[in-house]
Regions:
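Ribonuclease/tRNase effector modules and their secretory precursors
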Residues: 1-125
């Protein structure tokens, strides 16, 4: 029996959804850029995406992100893939300079579900 080739993880839809749902909550005038990084479980591929805004981010501007920001989004992929992506955006941790995004990817065909974590980091220049 031939071993089934694992499909390479494509982060395009994930990045698009983060841009659509997460970024509008933050004042773009105060961001230098936003760095989105993640790791695909299957092949440990790094996902990197830089959104350029052309403005310096000062330390004080991090206060513009509301304390305890807590947004939950659900993004359903095309029904043929039978996948559901949940986006949970939270300003947390001691380091107020990043927003953690946890994505739960569950497949209706299998009983297994796994978590992918992505950091949206506000770079301070």
């Amino acid at each position: 029996m031939a071993k089934k080739k694992r499909k390479k993880y494509d982060p395009t839809h994930l990045i698009a959804a983060i841009e659509k749902w997460a970024l509008p909550f933050y004042d773009k005038k105060h961001c230098y850029y936003i760095y989105v990084e993640g790791r695909a479980r299957s092949n440990q591929t790094r996902i990197e995406h830089i959104v350029e805004h052309g403005h310096d981010l000062k330390v004080r501007d991090l206060d513009l992100i509301p304390e305890g920001i807590n947004h939950y989004f659900e993004y359903k992929k095309d029904s043929t893939y039978k996948n559901t992506y949940n986006y949970y955006i939270n300003r947390g941790g001691k380091d107020k300079g990043f927003i953690k995004v946890s994505i739960r990817i569950s497949d209706k065909d299998s009983k297994r579900a796994w978590i992918k974590t992505i950091f949206i980091t506000y770079k301070i220049k």
